[in-house]
Amino acid sequence: MNKNKIFLAKKTLQYLEKKKLRDINLKNFLSNTKVPNMNNKIDLISNINDFFDFQLKKSLVNIEKSSQRDMLFEIMMARYDILNEYRTSVKNIINYFMSRPQGVLKLIPKLIESKILIATFANINPSGIQGVIKIKIIFVVYYITLFTWFNDENESLEKTMSVLDKYLNNIEK
């Protein structure tokens, strides 16, 4: 991820700590940035998602190899920890899309890419029919758990860990 996109993601997240996504005036907001192809709020959120993926990759450099299930747990929790650093901003984004679900549809390809990244780091092959099914399962588990994260005010994310652990255990059965 290039430094201009990182700068824009951080700028957007910083803005969203205090203001709502719906209040962003794109022309003014993007006036001092050097990132091409930022045409709408979906592009801004897509860039933030890329930034979170970039942060996740950096955090997983020394991940301990273990079972796929344990690695999925560690990787997903690492992602929730990253989201937690920007909690207010992420909650603003989620709230924005709760009232505009059609916008999420435009983000699905980018969100799937993120789940493929998670699967790959967990040594899960995303190819073929089995891979597609596994990605769909990871997608569902991740977003169901995200709703727990949304309400988990504990800094250690105990509720989030518990719910994620429960769902991953159910998948194994």
Task: Tell me the role of every PLM-derived stretch.
Residues 57-60, 112-129, 165-169:
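Short amphipathic alpha-helical segments and their helix-coil junctions
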Residues 153-161:
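Short conserved catalytic/interaction loops centered on acidic-Pro-aromatic/His motifs
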Residues 1-30, 35, 45-46, 50:
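Short, amphipathic alpha-helix enriched in basic
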Residues 130-150, 163-170:
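Hydrophobic alpha-helical segments that form the core
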Residues 11-18, 55-59, 93, 141-152:
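Solvent-exposed, amphipathic alpha-helical segments
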Residues 101-124, 132-143:
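Amphipathic alpha-helical packing segments from all-alpha helical-bundle domains
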